[in-house]
Regions:
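Short beta-strand to alpha-helix junction loop
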Residues: 60-80, 209-212
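Short, solvent-exposed loop/turn segments at secondary-structure junctions
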Residues: 11, 34, 130-131
Length: 229
């Protein structure tokens, strides 16, 4: 049985991991050249032990304790999932989905990725709400077997020197990274007058702040698959 997951984020990866345990053939499609980049998520990992999939690097680039770089987690997980047989369709957009019967979808794919044209899948999983790619033409997912639905709002993250952390008060998350920098994250249209900000990350994140945590999102993906029946 072939499964297409559209929207490459940690919810998709959790879903893919669970489906792999049941022997399914998994494809993950999205716009990016490398899934996880550019980063639009906080570097928060509160319960690493809850994730059954390895994602560590020998150099520990991804982080330490509860401060783990989201983009490195995605990179490490991509490698592990590929080893397990997941096929990644980078630079790919879903043009159309036609439901032929209850167990078969005909999907047209386009882009500069590995697959183009019309392909058949038994299950379509829409996890695009776990991603934020405003520059890309949206996937046209008129039909899907499973949809990850979450309420989101604007959010903003500041990457700054650790010495400037006291300038960013009332942050939902303030993270001290392994590289010596810090991240401060806020909901809504937050503004700062600090001129020493290194990077500003504008994104859309869940209203439920617990879903900003990488481990929570991976677990949500696993549950999305287990609850499908």
């Amino acid at each position: 049985m072939k499964i297409l997951i559209v929207g490459a984020g940690l919810v998709a990866y959790g879903c893919a991991y669970s489906a792999l345990q049941e022997g399914y053939e998994i494809y993950i499609a999205d716009h990016a050249i490398e899934f996880g980049l550019p980063n639009v998520w906080p570097s928060v990992l509160l319960d690493r032990q809850s994730i059954p999939l390895s994602f560590s690097t020998d150099q520990q680039f991804e982080g330490v304790e509860s401060s783990f770089r989201h983009e490195w987690i995605m990179k490490g997980m991509s490698i592990e999932l590929a080893k397990l047989g997941v096929k990644f369709l980078h630079r790919t957009r879903v043009v159309s989905v036609e439901e032929l019967d209850s167990n078969l979808y005909q999907v047209e794919l386009t882009g500069a990725g590995q697959l183009n044209g019309v392909h058949d899948y038994n299950v379509i999983i829409n996890t695009t709400q776990d991603t934020w790619i405003p520059w890309a033409t949206p996937h046209n997912l008129s039909n899907s077997s499973i949809m990850y639905d979450v309420e989101r709002q604007e959010a903003i993250g500041y990457v700054h020197l650790r010495s400037q952390s006291n300038e960013f008060t009332n942050a939902i998350y303030q993270i001290d990274r392994q590289d010596g920098l810090s991240e401060s994250w806020y909901s809504g249209n937050h503004m700062t007058t600090n001129r020493k900000v290194i990077e500003i990350i504008s994104t859309m994140l869940p209203i439920n702040h617990s879903l900003w945590d990488c481990s929570e999102r991976f677990q949500t993906g696993m549950k999305l698959w287990s609850d499908r029946k």
